[in-house]
Every structure is written in C-alpha cells, then in structure tokens.
C-alpha cells in the first residue's frame, strides 16, 4: 500500500540541459562569493597551485565553497523542477 502511494507521488526524472548547467554555475559563483566574504581563514593549508587563479583560497576553502555551491544548485534545480519551471 505504501509503495504504490510512494510510486504515485514520484515525479519524472529531470534530464540534464544547459539550463541546469547554468543554474549550477551561478549557484557555485554565489557560494564562492559568499565564502570569500565569510571564511575566517580562506588561505589555510594545504595551498593550491597557482593561488591567484583560485582567488587566494586554500584547498579546504575551495572544497567547502564548491560543496556548498553544489548543495545550493541541487536545491534550486530540484525546487524549480518540482514547480514545473524547468
């Protein structure tokens, strides 16, 4: 009984499109900007090669901001898909 209700509530899977990619890129840019303003020690060790290319971030800050950006992006994509916008 519960399984049939769960299957009836399931939506169609979202296919990748350039719109999804653009949303993910924008979400990551927002997360990196937010991280640049709020991370206390952005250049913590281990350092990345070509620090200027990565905005002076160390590996922990870069991983943290991009992970946060992916969480934001997935939330946006799934939310917009659920609303029927994409």
UniProtKB/Swiss-Prot annotation:
Q: Which UniProt keywords apply?
A: Membrane, Photosynthesis, Photosystem I, Thylakoid, Transmembrane, Transmembrane helix
Show the coiled coil region(s): none
Alphabetical GO CC annotations of the entry are: photosystem I; plasma membrane-derived thylakoid membrane
- Lineage top rank: taxon: Bacteria
State the compartments where it is located. Answer: Cellular thylakoid membrane
Question: Which SUPFAM superfamilies does the entry mention?
Answer: Photosystem I reaction center subunit X, PsaK
Q: How does it sit in the membrane?
A: Multi-pass membrane protein
- Its transmembrane ranges are 14-34, 60-80
Pfam families per record: PSI_PSAK
Tell me, how does this one assemble?
The cyanobacterial PSI reaction center is composed of one copy each of PsaA,B,C,D,E,F,I,J,K,L,M and X, and forms dimeric and tetrameric complexes.
- By its UniProt entry, which NCBIfam families does this protein fall under? PS_I_psaK
- Family, per the entry? Belongs to the PsaG/PsaK family.
The molecule here is called Photosystem I reaction center subunit PsaK 1
Its taxonomic path starts at:
Bacteria, Bacillati, Cyanobacteriota, Cyanophyceae, Nostocales
The gene coding this protein: psaK1
